[in-house]
């Protein structure tokens, strides 16, 4: 579960700040 959360966080930040 934790690895999934850590993998999903960068994607969420990418969407919010639009810096992919």
Curated annotation (Swiss-Prot):
Gene Ontology annotations of biological process type: defense response to bacterium; killing of cells of another organism
Disulphide bond pairs: 14-20
Keywords: Amphibian defense peptide, Antibiotic, Antimicrobial, Cytolysis, Disulfide bond, Hemolysis, Secreted
Pfam hit, one: Antimicrobial_1
Domain of life according to the entry: Eukaryota
Assigned GO CC terms: extracellular region
Location in or out of the cell: Secreted
KW Glycosyltransferase (keyword) present: no
Entry annotated with the keyword Zinc-finger: no
Expression sites by tissue: Expressed by the skin glands.
InterPro entries recorded: Antimicrobial_frog_1
Family assignment from sequence similarity: Belongs to the frog skin active peptide (FSAP) family. Brevinin subfamily.
Role noted for this protein: Antimicrobial peptide. Has low activity against the Gram-positive bacterium S.aureus and the Gram-negative bacterium E.coli (MIC<15 uM). Has a strong hemolytic activity.
Protein name: Brevinin-1DYc
Source organism of the structure: Rana dybowskii
